[in-house]
Amino acid sequence: MTSKINEANTDIKEDFFRGLHNGIPICLGYVSVGFTFGMMCTENGLSFLVAVLISLTNLTSAGQFAGTALIISGGSLLEIGITTFVINLRYMLMSLSISQKVDVALSIPKRMLMSFGITDEIFGVSMQTKGNISFAYFMGLMILPILGWSGGTLIGATAVSLLPDMVRSALGIAIYGMFLAVIIPPARTERAAAWVIAIAAAISCILYYVPFFSGISSGWMIIICAVAASSIAAVLWPAADEEEANA
């Protein structure tokens, strides 16, 4: 009995440290983006404590940036809520996918804790795991990225005042680089993805430059562009059924 317990504890430790190791590259990538977020917050009047708290409780990259930008611009609660919901809706699908690879006996509190740490990168790495995803592995995988995201936010929020204006201006475009890194790879391989990007960009330009739509806030523009572009793509380029894809 004792040997079995020791073996189980060893497996848990091995899974945890394997996840910790796999989370290192994600952590390093998140530091730079978190730095940009922290800089954005303090330059727009939010304290570094608020910036770090947002990062610790969100961990949603694009949704976090969009939601915070709306807070800074004075957007309504409804506007902020719908915008972040639409942008973060993909996490529901990721959670459903991961739920198929965890032990059915895993408790709901542990499942909820795992769902908190799901990001695009963590999801991608975890889904490459052969067999089931253990709770210990996922905890190890999400710890360093959370620390990297929050730590980067803290550094950016506190150190930005020490940087020259030229450097601060250059770092300000880092978020756009992050978004380009997200959309360009799928656009190069999937025609539908490229069209979704083009349609969303066209709608955004119309809403921004046509005087008739000048009363629409940036938050509602994001919602309209996302819903309209994805709806058009769903009609014109519906996803093939699994049976058709495997045929």
Predicted regions and their residues:
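Selective transmembrane alpha-helices of multi-pass membrane proteins
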Residues: N88, R168-A198
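Transmembrane alpha-helical segments of multi-pass membrane transport proteins and ion-pumping complexes
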Residues: Y30-M39, A62-F65, N88-L96, E121-V125, ...
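Membrane-interfacial helix-loop connectors
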Residues: E43-G45, L49-V50, I54-L89
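Helix-loop-helix junctions within the multi-pass membrane cores of secondary transporters/permeases
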Residues: S3-A8, G81-G172
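Loop-to-transmembrane alpha-helix initiation sites
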Residues: R168-I173, G215-A228
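Short, Lys/Arg-rich, polar N-terminal cytosolic tail immediately upstream
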Residues: M1-F17
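Extracellular/periplasmic helix-loop-helix junctions in multi-pass membrane proteins
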Residues: T189-A194, I206-I223
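Membrane-interface capping segments at transmembrane-helix boundaries
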Residues: V235-A247
